[in-house]
Amino acid sequence: MTHLHFDNRLRQQLPGDPEEGARRREVGAAWSSVLPTPVAAPYLIAHSAEMAQVLGLEAAEIASAQFAQVFGGNALYPGMQPWAVNYGGHQFGHWAGQLGDGRAISLGEAIGTDGGRYELQLKGAGPTPYSRGADGRAVLRSSIREFLCSEAMHHLGVPTTRALSLVGTGEAVVRDMFYDGHPQREPGAIVCRVAPSFIRFGNFELPSARGDIALLKQWVDFTIARDFPALAGAGEALYADWFAQVCERTAVMVAHWMRVGFVHGVMNTDNMSILGLTIDYGPYGWVDDYDPDWTPNTTDAQGRRYRFGTQPQVAYWNLGRLAQALAPLFADQALLQYGLDRFRDTYLACDRRDTAAKLGLAECRDEDLQLIDALRALMRESEMDMTLTFRGLIDLSPEHPDPAQLRDAFYDEDKRLVDAPQLQQWLQRYAARLQQDPLSPEERRARMRLANPRYVLRNYLAQQAIDRAEQGDPSGVQELLEVMRRPYDDQHGRDAFAARRPDWARDRAGCSMLSCSS
């Protein structure tokens, strides 16, 4: 018997539709009741030990057949009351109307051993009223990617939703991976995602767009009371403080993305968490050879709206859409602008903080922003790996800066040789700056190690684990999870996981760019 205790405040305190079944346009309801659709033979592939501990789940319970049944969608623990949430969103810059949880089903809000609230949500557990024409299922490859990235981002120190479990369904799912008219059968899986809240910008956009200001206000009041309990006051002042905090949290999140080289790939407003958590891991990726114009999403290959370098601007634009949705609650629109200004101020402060940390400086001067920009330009011109370049700077000697320290960061040997003088010039400039800095060599290296990961979840690493899992060997998933639990440490015997993208992976599907097919 589970020790999980559920307190399902969203379902209790927001208006919903208790009717299960038919897919429909839902008006006036924040959520709809829905049951997961049972699968043939659920089996546990992997789980997060840390997340299980927070929830108070013991090893014997996780290993039980009942656990796979529950988190495979075939059974419920006492207190679970499944629902799907209704929301809208802007997708690639255009209003898309009602979207909703098309294949995500929340089982309940559990109270953890730390007293925190943790919503448990199955992704791929079958259709909901918001599935439109889809089957509500998920394939193994996308589920592995979401499971691994949720935990990898947490251990990198990036605000994120978490993952408890990855369960195979024992059933096949038909997907057209490349949208080229050649669908194939793939193994199915279900991820249990975990977060204090899965509320999105789109939860406020939809009622506002429909003119349902009463429901909009209910969403805002509920979100503040449950998820922002430290905020005090009432009326517009309270709403303004809340919006400013949402803006601040979003800025912190995106700054972390830029620090570690993460590209979300689909920054639609329905994929933006009101808590400033990274959410919805689809066609994401990590920057290999540095390119601010790179996106891993094939759907965005031409417009590149969500490319790496524009993520801060897109986040600001998305917050503008949220402000627009909240505007009916404000007589004084200037209060919303204050929140948007808070985003910019917070992001710039985070950028300066991260610049100092990545370069091993006590503080970031204005000229240090120019210094790191010059390095980025050099990385782009010379096809240098972002992660390996910054990690390689840790052991650089300020007295004798040697370009050989960064040899492994180059993808093109010819460019390494041609651009060697420019790199040497930059390193000398950097070394001179280090000699002006008050940090000791030990303090500098320690600071840099905490800002520059050695291991990131490169797409080719995830794809190798997927390939093995699809052949019946899930050990690669567990091994990769273990490596990503300590991304800033030098792990003995695991150099292969820190290597730059191999040549064979440059253009292979799943290793460079990905579709939204999942």
UniProtKB/Swiss-Prot annotation:
Biased composition regions of type Basic and acidic residues, renumbered to the chain: 1-10
EC supergroup of this enzyme: transferase
Keywords: ATP-binding, Magnesium, Manganese, Metal-binding, Nucleotide-binding, Nucleotidyltransferase, Transferase
EC annotation from Swiss-Prot or TrEMBL: 2.7.7.-, 2.7.7.108
Reaction(s) catalysed by this chain's protein: L-seryl-[protein] + ATP = 3-O-(5'-adenylyl)-L-seryl-[protein] + diphosphate; L-threonyl-[protein] + ATP = 3-O-(5'-adenylyl)-L-threonyl-[protein] + diphosphate; L-tyrosyl-[protein] + ATP = O-(5'-adenylyl)-L-tyrosyl-[protein] + diphosphate; L-histidyl-[protein] + UTP = N(tele)-(5'-uridylyl)-L-histidyl-[protein] + diphosphate
Molecular function in Gene Ontology: AMPylase activity; ATP binding; magnesium ion binding
Active site: D270 (proton acceptor)
Region (Disordered): 1-25
Protein task: Nucleotidyltransferase involved in the post-translational modification of proteins. It can catalyze the addition of adenosine monophosphate (AMP) or uridine monophosphate (UMP) to a protein, resulting in modifications known as AMPylation and UMPylation.
Assigned protein family: Belongs to the SELO family.
Protein name: Protein nucleotidyltransferase YdiU
Taxonomic placement: Bacteria, Pseudomonadati, Pseudomonadota, Gammaproteobacteria, Lysobacterales
